[in-house]
């Protein structure tokens, strides 16, 4: 998937038919991979709105088909480990991609665009992360290196 000149791998789950729910929902409509679900699933039915180098959560009211939902505070709903670090990671990644996209669009240099896109794939998706080390620290180091390579302050 290419978004504004940056290649981003996507996870796409095929459902049984158009409009069908997630294939990982069990007979009771509950997530069967709950402990290992992706980040976007962890916040569902919330979404994110990015503003002023941060983001906030919004409730997507038509996406969840469950009826008679109870009210739950956002802070209780999101059960991501190391929530503060995770939110900083999400913010840093989002605004890094925006900065790269702006820089590449301004350059118009097809070779630079391709080279930068491949470096992002290599640094963040292909090069393995060490499971015995903190993910966020590893990400931060890679982000600093990639910003230097891409000429982003």
Features from the language model and the residues they span:
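Short loop/turn segments that flank or connect secondary-structure elements
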Residues: 1-153
